[in-house]
Amino acid sequence: RVALAARKHLQTEFSPDEEIVCVTENDACGVDAVQVLTGCSIGKGNLIYHDTGKQAFSFYSRKDGRKVRVVFKMALNREEHSRDVLKEKILSASDEELFDFTEPADLPPNKARLFSSIVCEECGEMAPEHKIRLHDGRKLCLGCFPDYSRGW
């Protein structure tokens, strides 16, 4: 429902390239529908995960500058209703009953960049240059880079 509502607000269809961008604030199952119905994907660089845990999605059209933030607002009490009842409520509600529509405060994210690959000097696997760290003069991937934490 989020993806269809966003497409309606942006007056667009499926995006085969990077014309539509989605910033999702959760990693729940609704993100799967966003990928299928909008064409946004992590691999193409036009689906960006910004973890706030909210059922909120910001959509941007690079083609014409339209944008919309869609936030799920319907209160669903899982203790009072079965899964089937909740599903029916979601499917039968209007977009306005389900969602708040506002304009995102942020600018659209930049287009995806391509980076050179660097060989990790510890494991021998390649990683993009922006994910390589220097440790004692050696280029290490994030998996081989020793954790450095001081508690904050």
Model-found features: residue ranges?
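A structural-propensity feature for long, helix-poor, extended segments
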Residues: 19-59, 63
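Cysteine-rich micro-motifs
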Residues: 134-147
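Short, non-ligating residues that shape and space the ligands of small metal-coordination modules
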Residues: 129-130, 150-151
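Short, flexible, mixed-charge glycine/proline-rich loop motifs
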Residues: 107-117, 130-135
